Amino acid sequence: MGPAGSVLSSGQMQMQMVLWGSLAAVAMFFLITFLVLLCSTCDREKKPRQHSGDHENLMNVPSDKDMFSHSATSLTTDALASSEQNGVLTNGDILSEDSTLTCMQHYEEVQTSASDLLDSQDSTGKAKCHQSRELPRIPPENAVDEILTARAADTELGPGVEGPYEVLKDSSSQENMVEDCLYETVKEIKEVADKGQGGKSKSTSALKELQGAPMEGKADFAEYASVDRNKKCRHSANAESILGTCSDLDEESPPPVPVKLLDENANLPQEGGGQAEEQAAEGTGGHSKRFSSLSYKSREEDPTLTEEEISAMYSSVNKPGQSAHKPGPCMKGPESACHSMKGLPQRSSSSCNDLYATVKDFEKTPNSISTLPPARRPSEEPEPDYEAIQTLNREDEKVPLETNGHHVPKESDYESIGDLQQCRDVTRL
């Protein structure tokens, strides 16, 4: 048992050693890989990015600005010369002292050439030597430009005015002072062309005088811009004003006066008035009694009826309290009868059918109102319409009307209409 047990124990020890060794190897492998990854990331961050070939070619090719750039004085390209002297500069190259010196020398040459150019020009801005290229000069189109250029040439000799820029600035300021708007510009040019060269004060004063009336020698466009358009506007405004006044008159015209419609029983006032005059002239009681005893009949029932009797039936009303004999002045039209009733206070609309008399009642002054007594004696001859209105007022006041010794009870409108065939006295409404 002894040697066998020792062999088993040694085998177990070897197995444990192998297991521990393998675990240590695996741990070391993972540790080494982790460290390698860390180092690789550090190297990538420290190393500069490598550009591709296409990118390098694009960076090395000179740009269009370098190829076609010109200096202020020379007509040749300076970029090509500098590239030939210094060579092609690539990314990352360090300029040497020689290259910096050449660049400084080139910059000094440019400065001296600019100064020489300024010296070559005289005080008026014109070049002393012949230039191969000159800008064309625009000829003056009108007399105003000639005046302004002459004034600018006179002011060139001043101490503060040197060079073309100041001259142009002075002339532009004078133009702005003389000509402020389009219409003044057109008038200034035409005025100078007609009258010749003149002062600025004269031209401005003439402009103010010529604003209202056009000159005969002006062109069509100037007249259209300043005169004809205003005429058209005035013409259209006048036409609109005339139309507007006509429309206003039509709108403000009062409504037509309504036509007065007479009562059905008073549609023949003239014939009724003639009958009353005939009755007053004849003075016969039998004839008037016949008129009063008429009830509405036709010729078939009574063939002895005349035209006057028939017209009296349809144009007369039987009313109690009226006498058959009436003088001529008492038989008046409904309008005159209603006009005589202006003194009655607070008359209802049903008391008189005349609309105009109702309106005139309120328009008249109290001095012109002819007041009438509230009650009349039986011997007096009342007017027909006044009696009808007085009867209605008495009905409202509940005062009994006594006529010819008979007591007339209070009656309604229907009863008064029914009494038209029964009463004996004929009156006119």
UniProtKB/Swiss-Prot annotation:
For the keyword Phosphoprotein, the answer is yes
What molecular function terms (GO) are annotated for this protein?
A: SH2 domain binding
Q: Which residues carry this modification: Phosphotyrosine?
A: Y107, Y165, Y183, Y224, Y314, Y356, Y386, Y414
Give the start-end ranges of region Interaction with NHERF1: 427-429
Please name the Pfam families in this protein's record: PAG
Q: Which GO terms are recorded in the biological process aspect for this UniProt protein?
A: adaptive immune response; intracellular signal transduction; negative regulation of T cell activation; regulation of T cell activation
Location(s) in or outside the cell: Cell membrane
List every stretch annotated Interaction with CSK.
Answer: 314-317
Q: What quaternary structure, including any partners, is listed in this protein's UniProt entry?
A: When phosphorylated, interacts with CSK. Interacts with NHERF1/EBP50. In resting T-cells, part of a PAG1-NHERF1-MSN complex which is disrupted upon TCR activation.
| Stated name of the protein | Phosphoprotein associated with glycosphingolipid-enriched microdomains 1
Q: What is the lineage of its organism?
A: Eukaryota, Metazoa, Chordata, Craniata, Vertebrata
